[in-house]
Structures are given as C-alpha cells and as structure tokens.
Amino acid sequence: MSTPELKKVSAKPDLLLSTHHSLCPGCGEPLALRVILELLGELDVAERTICVCGIGCYTAFPGIIDIDVLQALHGRAPSVATGAKRVLPDRFVFTLQGDGDMVSEGLQEIIHSAARGERFTAVLLNNGVFGETGGHMTTTSVLGQRTKTTMDTGRIAEKHGYPIKIADLLAQVDGSAYVARGAMHTPSAIAWTKRILGEAFRVQLEGQGFSFVEILTMCPTDWYVEPAETPDWIERNFAGTYPLKILKHP
C-alpha cells in the first residue's frame, strides 16, 4: 500500500521572528497575529508598515514580529496612528488593540478617528475581558458573562449597563469607509476574517478612508473554560451579540 504524499498547507509567516510567546494556551490573539502577518506579506507592504500597539496581552507581540511598531498608552493608539499616517502618508498604518484598551479606555479616540476619516486601519481583538489585568469586565463583555468583577451574577444590564457594539457604532459614522467583524474560533471563521481584513487593508491602500475590523478572540483563562471548549463558548455567548458580517463597505 503506497503512502499518500504529504503537502505542507501552511508555514510560519516570514514576518514572525519566533513562535514563542507569553500568552496563555488556547488564546486566540496569536492566531489573529498570524493572519495579519500573512496579509502584510501577501500585500507586500511589510517594509513600509507601522503597527501602533495598545496595552494588553498582545503587547507581547512587538518583540516577535519583523515590522516597525509604535507603543501607545492605554486607549491612545488611534491618535498615535493618526499622527503617524499624517506625517508619513506613504506608510501602511494599523492599530492593534483589545476591547479593554480600545472600547473601555479609548472610546473617544476610535470614534473621533473614524469621524475624521483617518486613513489607517484599526484592528480590535475582542475577548470581552481585561485579560492582562486579571479578567475584569470590559464594555464589550456580553450580558450574563462571568468575569472577575461579575463573578456571582454575570453581567447584568441594570447594574453594569449593556455591551457596546463598537463595530455597529463605527459603521454609523460618516467618516468610516469599511467596517466588519470576524473571529478566530473555527477554520471557516479564520478564513472569513482573513478575507475581511484583506479588504480593510486594501481600503487603506486605495486611500478610501478609515477601515475597521473587529476580531473575536478566545480567552479560556478568563472565561473559565478549557481551551477546547472556547469555540462553543463563542457560539453560545458571543454570536448573538456580535455576528460575523460586513457592516459597511465602499
């Protein structure tokens, strides 16, 4: 019986310097980083790319990626990206932020950047918790979600307010050109996310205005589930509030 020929279908992106990182097993953020790096290579923009990184678990990434990175203070990445893109308009600029950084701490920054039609791409890694500081509730935590600060009851609207659907909000802003939402919990979701992220990047490359992609990422540590259970957790808890779709396009 002959042995079937094995084909390599995926390899480490050239822009990824090391596969070692300090994030938890089962975290979805390294998967999102891989998709981003693959696209930067495929679009041949890595040499002129500037990533503006927020504060979160993903702040561990700048040391393992072969692109220029600016480190911003909590929530301020869109303002830093605005300055970088205006001073260096030929550069490809994107922000990398979590929900705590972008939506809880820097909501005004992202809204005003979209309203001005700033010509960079904002990428949100949304896992519904402040992962780096111990798993506290953020503005995107869904109703009923147990976090370090909503452990007994889960998030209750009457006490904690409703989650902010930032992609839906930005889609209503006149200055935004492209807004979409993806996820990292299944192969099909990853393929979808690569597609929409590529479209968002092309919007910037074509000078069409502000582009935004929200990516739902897994956090087994602060969801209190095993890594293998996180895909089902997203379907049960996030899908109703944050459906995967394109909300706005040119």
Residue ranges and their predicted role:
Residues 1-94, 206:
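Thiamine diphosphate
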Residues 24-25, 69, 97-99, 154-155, ...:
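A generic structural signal for short
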Residues 54, 98, 125-127:
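Cofactor-binding loop segments of dinucleotide-utilizing enzymes, especially the Rossmann-like FAD-
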Residues 56-58, 100, 218:
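Short glycine-rich anion-binding loops that position phosphate/pyrophosphate groups of nucleotides
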Residues 90, 104-121, 125, 129-250:
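Glycine-rich ThDP/TPP pyrophosphate-binding loop and its adjacent helix/strand module
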Residues 95-105:
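Gly/Ser-rich oxyanion-binding loop with an adjacent helix/lid
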